[in-house]
Amino acid sequence: LDRLVFLSDFHPNDESAFITGSHLQVYQIAKLLSEYRESHLLVSTNDQSKVGKVIKEGELFVHYLRNPRYEILKIPIFLKRVLEIEPTLVFQRGRSALTVVGFLSKVLLSSTFIWSSNAQEGIDFLKYTRFLSRKGKIRAIFGFLLDLLINISLEGADLVVAQNEEQRGKAEERFWWKEIRMCKNLQEIPERFEKFEKPTVIWVGRLDENKNPKIFIDLAKEFPECEFLMVGYGNEELIRDRPGNLKFFGKLPREETLRLISSSWVLVNTSESEGIPNVILEAMLCGTPVLSLNVRVEGIAYNVFCGDIKVLIERLRNLLSSREKVLNLGENLRREALRVFVEESRECWLRVILPPYNTF
């Protein structure tokens, strides 16, 4: 009997946690596969009332485990539950301690281990060491040790799945002896809402320097006659100098965030580097045009990539000048997103994970 386990740091609806696109993607893929095989999603939580519980969401079993102070301690916590379930396949996305759990599942249970990349830098060597070196020598040492474990685990994966051509190229270069496949992000179809009467631009993301929230503030100053909405949390010092036409919401429930995205005229993404941000795809499925400073979206007819702030400003000005342009482009983007990130992506993930396709 096939029994599938999906590993994720947090449930995407966990209000006590710091949620990323990886958490949402693992959840979406686990929900899809639960329609075909017994599927278990293992997540950690800071909500003590949920720790130890198994809650069924549709056909998906969600296991809530204790969230330890140090990430490396997730390895024994998650591995213990995996050994109890005895899965035939373990899926994990992004570079974390859970990558090690996936590899140990293969070693101890002979489970198939599939690893999926998130951002491009996740394929690099010693990612955690570079990140933690800014926070002191002790944390850098632990980061180095965790990085070594993760790298060993990545090399032991049965299959590596990339989400775009750039990632596939990096993965093929690093894991030249492995099979590399590409599956784009999987999306549910969100509810749609009527556009705001006034031209409105939205930005959604973490308030980190690599997300460049300051650029969105500069855009708001460039278009004082328009409304600018910002949803996210993190270092609010980065957006201290925001103008009066920019409204900051902080952290919102996902449903409320999607409502704002759907009602806005344009979504702007200013991140330095990402895979395929979920928020971009969600905007497309809501019928909201997207302009991205650095991120490319492959497989669709419309080019969301700007590459230069002057180009972004020019294209934004053109869209904000006409509600009809926004609505027409939004409908075209929605059709493309439905085809690529709902229909084709669904079939791709089923081919990758369900037997007999996953014979490596």
Where do the language-model regions lie?
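Short His-centered aromatic/hydrophobic patch
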Residues: 92-98, 117-118
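Short hydrophobic beta-strand element within catalytic cores of glycosyltransferases
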Residues: 280, 289-292
